[in-house]
């Protein structure tokens, strides 16, 4: 599948999950990028205080998903799969690609809880697990489009953990895919968000030799 076709299908397939974020994330006509992402105060699993937009998103190439430590099945599978993505992307994670997992249970998921959770999966530097005030987390979730129209479903944390949002803030380029997609495919899709003249080779992604844009 070529890049243009994939990007189209990616947005089509995630219409429900990203419905409220489409015009927010899709172009430059809505104003500066900083107004599209809440600049909420958060803490990382290393207990470092950060601002979501200023410190984590502005000018960066990111991968973002939602999770919670007490999730019994889906979250561990998704985290393990994304750990494979991190391995494939290699040293680029933390240098020019940044991975973020935001808890949907901030009351329980303190930095210490998230640190223990990340250690279970051998998470390497460049991937931050984030918590914050419940209202702020809810605002972030909604702003990036993880919303259900049915208010009962929207209150169910398990309804918001199946997708990965990825993009390049400096280019205002965004897409999403299922968190349990093949890890090599996710890594390839992430690299499609770059300003490059050639598409990343699937074989290179498979072998974990992802390179910077040509």
Question: Residue locations for each model-derived region?
Answer:
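Conserved helix-turn-beta segment immediately C-terminal to the redox Cys motif
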Residues: 79-100
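N-proximal helix/coil linker or "cap" segments that precede and/or mark the start of modular domains
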Residues: 15-39
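N-terminal secretory signal peptides and thylakoid transit peptides that target proteins
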Residues: 1-14
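Thiol-/selenol-based redox modules, centered on thioredoxin-like
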Residues: 154-214
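Short, internal strand/loop/helix patches
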Residues: 116-161
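Short active-site neighborhood of thiol/selenol oxidoreductases, capturing the structured segment around
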Residues: 56-74, 82
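Thiol-based oxidoreductase modules, predominantly thioredoxin-like and allied folds used
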Residues: 96-109, 126-135
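A short beta-strand-turn-helix
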Residues: 41-61
């Amino acid at each position: 599948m070529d890049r243009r076709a994939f990007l189209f299908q990616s947005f089509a397939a995630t219409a429900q999950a990203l419905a409220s974020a489409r015009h927010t994330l899709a172009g430059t006509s809505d104003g500066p990028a900083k107004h599209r992402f809440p600049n909420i105060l958060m803490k990382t699993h290393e207990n470092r205080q950060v601002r979501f937009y200023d410190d984590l998103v502005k000018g960066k190439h990111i991968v973002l998903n939602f999770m919670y430590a007490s999730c019994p099945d889906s979250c561990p599978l998704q985290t393990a799969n994304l750990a494979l993505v991190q391995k494939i992307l290699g040293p680029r994670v933390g240098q020019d690609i940044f991975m973020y997992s935001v808890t949907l249970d901030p009351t329980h998921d303190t930095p210490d809880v998230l640190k223990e959770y990340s250690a279970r999966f051998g998470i390497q530097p460049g991937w931050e697990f984030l918590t914050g005030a419940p209202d702020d987390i809810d605002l972030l979730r909604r702003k990036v489009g993880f919303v259900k129209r049915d208010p009962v479903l929207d209150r169910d944390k398990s309804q918001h953990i199946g997708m990965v949002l990825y993009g390049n803030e400096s280019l205002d380029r965004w897409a999403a895919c299922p968190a349990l997609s093949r890890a090599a495919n996710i890594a390839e899709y992430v690299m499609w968000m770059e300003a490059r003249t050639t598409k990343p080779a699937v074989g290179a992604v498979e072998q974990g030799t992802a390179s910077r844009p040509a």
